[in-house]
Amino acid sequence: MLTHRIPRGVPEMPARRYIRRAWPLLPERDVRDAFARRDVKKNGARIAPADTVRGGDELTLYVNASFPLDVLFDDGHLLAVVKPQGLPVDVDQDGVGEDTLLSRLRAYHENARLLHRLDAQTGGVLLAALEEKTYQNGLAAFREHQLAKTYRAVAKGPFPAATGEWRDYLSKDARRATVRVVKHPGGGAKPIITRWRVLEELGENWFLVELEPVTGRTHQLRAHMAFYGHPILGDDKYGSRETRAARLHLW
């Protein structure tokens, strides 16, 4: 059973939509079956999927659910954990997010602090510090490029060479929660550097590539790849309809 007080300030929305946003990895079938059994309640009263909920309401969902943290490494100072694809790191812009990587981290160790992040639809390994000294040292290591983040993804080809590097600028559109690659600075655009290497041709003009976001801006890899005509398979924000079947993963 899941019992949850919706944070104040969360706007009104249908219960089913809120549940999908609050627990994004909860199987859709479990949510559908709970509503069919009338096992979803708002403030003690049974509700239907279209009934609305808002900040301050208490939501109860009778499902079997667990939210484990996949820990790869823990020496008491540093954690390496796996962020599943589809799990956001933190709550969204409306404050919705009962199950996030941060909530799982805090359940595992109350002092855990992430050293870097991944987009919600990207799965991979993240590092977290368990003490202040490790946290500051880790931030410095990323800032000074002593640690490299490498991604593997399937992207549309063909590529002009086996390896390459792109240097451009990235402009944010906060209202649409997107970014745009531009060739020149100005308007708040920040420099970006992306290195890429073709690992394998998979057929039908798809390639397995290794990507390194040297500058590590928000959505940098997805936007940069799409800008040069190599959208990542599964990218539902910057890719085309044909690319929305899988997701990228950080190794």
Segments predicted by a language model, with ranges:
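The conserved catalytic core of RNA pseudouridine synthases
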Residues: 111-139, 172-228, 250-251
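Short edge beta-strand segments in beta-sheet-rich domains
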Residues: 146-150, 165, 191, 245, ...
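A short, terminal or domain-edge coil/loop segment
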Residues: 93-99, 166-178, 206, 210-214, ...
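Pseudouridine synthases involved in rRNA/tRNA modification
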Residues: 1-33, 186-190, 203-206, 214-251
